[in-house]
Amino acid sequence: MAAPKARALGPEEKDECMKIFDIFDRNAENIAPVSDTMDMLTKLGQTYTKRETEAIMKEARGPKGDKKNLGPEEWLVLCSKWVRQDDEEEILRAFKVFDANGDGVIDFDEFKFIMQKVGEEPLTDAEVEEAMKEADEDGNGVIDIPEFMDLIKKSKNALKEA
């Protein structure tokens, strides 16, 4: 498994991450020992190889960071990676459900089925076709996994802004 990329955390996500950090900040010194990282990862349901963990830790600490301890900022960098990974796994599971024939793409009929189920009112074929054109970034007539992830992320962002 490749180390996930970081993403910005919302206020609630930051609060949750810091609650976990506080558990590992045993002496209330605003630090958590790096040696506990594997334990932290396991308790959070994350499974990385030792090499992946070292790469994540190196990125979180930065070039001049403390090699033995993590501060709150470094912890939030780590947390942002896990949150993004969970989001992507959830989107991938949804994609597999919507890809009814399992061919790795969502075609017009599968997309129409999705749009009919999530919309409040039934859409016409023309409306579905227009929505599909917007989601189909490369114009090949189907929606692949990266396009589906972009579609979901855009939808989430639109809902947050509304």
UniProtKB/Swiss-Prot annotation:
Single GO term (MF): calcium ion binding
Superkingdom: Eukaryota
SUPFAM superfamilies reported for this sequence: EF-hand (SSF47473)
UniProt entry keywords in alphabetical sequence: Acetylation, Calcium, Cytoplasm, Metal-binding, Methylation, Muscle protein, Repeat
Keyword Calcium appears in the UniProt entry: yes
Domain EF-hand stretches: 12-47, 49-84, 86-121, 123-158
InterPro entries from the UniProt entry: CALM/Myosin/TropC-like, EF-hand-dom_pair, EF_Hand_1_Ca_BS, EF_hand_dom
Annotated binding of Ca(2+) 1, by residue: 99, 101, 103, 110
Positions annotated to bind Ca(2+) 2: 136, 138, 140, 147
One cellular component term from this protein's GO annotations in UniProt: cytoplasm
PROSITE patterns linked: EF_HAND_1 (PS00018), EF_HAND_2 (PS50222)
N6,N6,N6-trimethyllysine PTM positions: 96, 117
Pfam families found in the cross-reference section: EF-hand_7 (PF13499)
Positions carrying N-acetylalanine: 2
Subcellular localization: Cytoplasm
Chief subcellular location: cytoplasm
Function noted in UniProt: The exact function of this protein is not yet known. It interacts with CAVPT, a protein also of unknown function, in a calcium-dependent way. This protein binds two calcium ions.
Protein name, UniProt field: Calcium vector protein
Provenance organism: Branchiostoma floridae (Florida lancelet)
